[in-house]
UniProtKB/Swiss-Prot annotation:
It comes from the Eukaryota. The keyword Transmembrane applies. The gene is DERL3. This is Derlin-3. Keywords: Endoplasmic reticulum, Membrane, Transmembrane, Transmembrane helix. Residues 44-58, 120-157 are lumenal.
Length: 231
């Protein structure tokens, strides 16, 4: 019964958040069970473009390392801030949300080539947190009960964790940079004098993912109108 309740709760999570979180968990579980190897997942341009192992363009965003503190920490922030974006500023705009993932993924992959980065899931997490924080400037965040600050400081606070653990912050900086590019092109530049939206979601994504808009001028035919017994 507990599993049924958990499954019901999970199915109530918005589609993009649910799909991405599940893909990350399943990928990590497959590696933990030795069904997959990280060497089959990491981004390698030679293997992608010469050996046509195109799945690496996606799988490098799904693996967050072995089960442990870092994995659960990343999953917590992926689930929380991806969901808040999808239920907040992207509510009813699934296609736009997916396009943000695609834009961020492509830009991170191109920039990751310069830094020889093999796994970019943490960068994607940083991008999600950054975009949410810039769109929620008045929200106060309680950081693990230790600090309280305004939302725009959250991405920088998160970057302090790998520094404390002695890890590189290059991936986090990449995610913040890509998040800022998206935020600027989507939220800042269109509101400037002479500015316009440069990031336009392809129409085929809208057809696939968004519910069709109702025509306000549409009048139902008589047989479509509720009768006395239906009212």
């Amino acid at each position: 019964m507990a599993w049924q309740g958990l499954a019901t709760e999970f199915l109530q999570v918005p589609a993009v958040t649910r799909t991405y979180t599940a893909a990350c968990v399943l990928t990590t579980a497959a590696v933990q069970l030795e069904l997959l190897s990280p060497f089959q997942l990491y981004f390698n341009p030679h293997l992608v473009f010469r050996k046509f192992q195109v799945w690496r363009l996606i799988t490098n965003f799904l693996f967050f390392g072995p089960l442990g503190f870092s994995f659960f920490f990343n999953m917590l922030f992926v689930f929380r801030y991806c969901r808040m974006l999808e239920e907040g500023s992207f509510r009813g705009r699934t296609a736009d949300f997916v396009f943000m993932f695609l834009f961020g993924g492509v830009l991170m992959t191109l920039l990751g080539l310069l830094g020889s980065l093999f796994f970019l899931g943490q960068a994607l997490t940083a991008m999600l947190v950054y975009v949410w924080s810039r769109r929620s400037p008045g929200v106060r965040v309680n950081f693990f009960g230790l600090l309280t600050f305004q939302a725009p400081f959250l991405p920088w606070a998160l970057m302090g964790l790998p520094m404390l653990l002695g890890n590189s912050i290059l991936v986090d900086l990449l995610g913040i940079a890509v998040g800022h590019v998206y935020y600027f092109l989507e939220d800042v530049f269109p509101n400037q004098p002479g500015g316009k939206r440069l990031l336009l979601t392809p129409s085929f994504l809208k057809l696939l993912l968004d519910a069709p808009e109702e025509d306000p001028n549409y009048l139902p035919l008589p047989e479509e109108q509720p009768g006395p017994l239906q009212q």
